[in-house]
Amino acid sequence: MANALAGNRIMCITWIAPDEYAATKLRDTVDDSIEFVRNSTPQEGPMRMIHSFFSEGPEYEMSESWIEGKHPPKTGRVILNLYEIYATEEGLDLAWVEAAEWFPTLAEMLEEFKIEMTVANQLSITHNLWD
């Protein structure tokens, strides 16, 4: 059903690691947090997490190659994304509070390995095609 997720809240964290070694360190940190998130996040009710996924791939140079069906050259950096969808704003707020204990470790790792981080938080889903 189209737009079944409309109105739900999403958070997206994008990390850009300068190389594969730094990306591996970030992957290890994410792997360490998965069980914590699984056990601390509501799976039912208005505060529930609807979906979460982690994706990654190489960073590519900006180029028109994509519209020609070709891949442009890779930069050597690695892009990693974490997406979490929650039923409500309050559910996403709770997720941040619950994750606070991980922030010092994450901040230290980002600084040590020179990993860039961008957060888009409390975005409201406006359209989705399929569930």
Per-region residue spans from a language model:
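Short S/T/G/P-rich N-terminal loop/turn motif that feeds into the first structured element of a domain
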Residues: 1-98, 111-131
